[in-house]
C-alpha cells in the first residue's frame, strides 16, 4: 500500500467518550494527484509519482509545467514517489484522498525535523556537564577526550561531537491513527511528528504494525 503526502497543521487534543485526553497531531492531506506511473519495462521498478497542493504559475519551471500538463493535473508544490506492491494499480491523473487510511490502524510519518543550528554535545547528544567548581574553571560543557592513544591514533567516524543539530529527515514509526476526517481532508495521529507547522510530511502504513 502506498502512502500520502500531507502538511503539518499543528497539535491539539481530543477526548474519548470516557473523558481521556489524547494528544494528536493534525495532518492536512489534500488530494494527491498522480503525475506519473513507473513500470518494470521502462523504469526497472514499479512506482507511482504524486503531487499535492498548488504552486504559483510564475514559480513553475518549463520542464515542470510540461510534466504536469502531460499528466493533465494542476501544478503542485512538489513531487513524491511511492513504490507499488504487487496488484496495486493507479492511472495518471487519478486523485487519491485521505480515505486511503480509513482502515489503517498505525502509520509511519516522515518529515524534516526543526533545525537547531550549531549545537554543543550537551544539547545535541545529552552529554553530562563536568564539575561546576572544584578546580574546573574552563571545561564545564566541553566533551572531554575524543580518542584513545597512539593506537588507533585517530578519531573514529561517527564520534558524537558538536555540530549541526536538527534539519534532517526523521521518521516516527507506529503512530496510532485516531481519526480520518475525509470531509476536511484531515488525518489525526496520536503524538508528535517531526518538523515545524506547515512542513510537508510523508504518511505511510506502519511497517511494524
From Swiss-Prot:
Entry coiled-coil feature ranges: none
Any one of the GO BP annotations: translation
Pfam families found in the cross-reference section: Ribosomal_L3
InterPro entries recorded: Ribosomal_uL3 (IPR000597), Ribosomal_uL3_bac/org-type (IPR019927), Ribosomal_uL3_CS (IPR019926), Transl_B-barrel_sf (IPR009000)
Post-translational modification: Methylated by PrmB.
A molecular function (GO) term: rRNA binding
GO cellular component, as recorded: cytosolic large ribosomal subunit
Gene3D superfamilies hit by this protein: 3.30.160.810, Translation factors
Lineage top rank: taxon: Bacteria
Keywords: Methylation, Ribonucleoprotein, Ribosomal protein, RNA-binding, rRNA-binding
Disulfides per UniProt: none
Modified residues (N5-methylglutamine): 150
Function: One of the primary rRNA binding proteins, it binds directly near the 3'-end of the 23S rRNA, where it nucleates assembly of the 50S subunit.
HAMAP family: Ribosomal_uL3_B
Record note on quaternary structure: Part of the 50S ribosomal subunit. Forms a cluster with proteins L14 and L19.
Family, as annotated: Belongs to the universal ribosomal protein uL3 family.
Protein name: Large ribosomal subunit protein uL3
Species of provenance: Salmonella typhimurium (strain LT2 / SGSC1412 / ATCC 700720)
